[in-house]
């Protein structure tokens, strides 16, 4: 019997669980990314040194291979290419309009506003000099329209700092545009769903910890989030409606929200892909028993996702390494309570002192709660 061929976009440590799971499921893996000696290059059955943004080159190769599905996890940029190729080859995926709305925060905000989804008010800025003319109430959040991973995000408390923040955000983005949006107070959460033929299945809600202002780099996650049933019910309904607004029909989604003290829910953003930072690849499976990565592969290949639990659910967390104190804490746990640590991921202690956003943290460890 001929092996099933699947394309995977990206080769970093974030994609490693996807590559490994696809091989475990009997697929031959064809991985596309620029050559950077990443772990996915070595794990793939076939690796192609093509940048993930070179959609037409990837499409040409995938057509030649005869893939039965294409997917990626934890990458907004990769999700554009995934849907481009899927649409061209009549494979399962979301429309290119949906890909735009779920990766460009301005288009997302417009869609949410038109559909009545609760989301911060925002203003699109294409010229930093416009800062002097903006009628906003401080504090505000400034961010690029098309980046993720806490890149180029600032909380600005006064007008004097607004222009420089806009300039920095624009320089961080691919299309060099920025959003200035109202600051939403409250606890941060993310919500994982898997969608199949337009039906959205809730998987998990995660409590998120960050460095706070000004850059909000994520420092850790806890799953399941400690919220009451009423709050969870409201969150699920809000997110389901927003997924329909964006047109997400197939595959994973990662929704970031804030909940204020009075229970008001605001959608910060939604990505048409699995949550990164080990949320989708590890925490969902540990805390719910569901194999989220397997579901992503199944949906990408036109197969209904399997909700059979693969392990007993147990609360789990992820903590990121920023400092020597974090390394010392990890060493202490490994010595005093080694069974608590499930694994250490992407450990690069040489990055301590050089961390600017989520992409260059010094690693993380996943633990039992």
Question: What do these predicted ranges mean?
Answer:
Residues 154, 182, 285, 363-369:
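Short, well-ordered beta-strand elements within core beta-sheets of diverse protein domains
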Residues 169-177, 182-225, 233-266, 271-280, ...:
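Phosphate-binding core of ATP-grasp and ATP-grasp-like enzymes
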Residues 130-131, 297-369:
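Peripheral (often C-terminal) accessory segments that flank ATP-dependent C-N-forming ligase machineries
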Residues 150, 271-287, 347-350:
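Glycine-rich phosphate/pyrophosphate-binding beta-alpha loops
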Residues 1-97, 305, 350, 358-360, ...:
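ATP-binding N-terminal substructure of ATP-dependent carboxylate-amine bond-forming enzymes
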Residues 287-300:
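C-terminal, non-catalytic macromolecule-binding modules
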Residues 103-179, 185, 197, 225-237, ...:
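Active-site nucleotide/adenylate-binding loops and adjacent lid/helix of ATP-dependent enzymes
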